[in-house]
Amino acid sequence: MEIYNGRPEKSDGRLLREVRTYDFLDDLGIEYKRTDHEPANNMEACNEIDAVLGVLICKNLFLCNRQKTNFYLLMMPGDKKFKTKELSAQINSARLSFADPEDMLKYLDIEPGAVSIMGLMNDKDHAVQLLIDEDVLAGEELGCHPCVCTSSLKMKTADVINKFLPATGHGYRTVHLVGED
């Protein structure tokens, strides 16, 4: 795997949602490193990418309440266990579960395996609430997918918080996840 500065030179063979991500970041003046790879749609596959980029790829979970009236995008360190009960208590929500792939596509224009904070640029109605574990915020840089699971990005956390999120119209809520039983 090679590391590149910024977007690919050519967009041939790339999905429109990926190209739109690069356009969005470039328009905001956000610098990023990129690597292309085989599909990485689980955290185990991301371990090698972590080593290449020199950053921990975030675990991104798309969740909803039982009634499917509230949707959440949770960003947490990839090596931390997710405990539904722990998060539900912090955000004062009844039972949370993984949202359907159809809702993922509808709100974030992302398919399973490629869930990423970058998808918030597609949530024009602000239906998705962003939850970020404090350990992600403590890192100087973060890693994520550009709305596809065949590329990964590394960028400054401050750029995501101070440039990307305001441009999408999304705020975030900090959560403290321990991930232990």
For the regions a language model picked out, list residue spans one by one.
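Extended, low-hydrophobicity, polar/charged segments
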Residues: 1-181
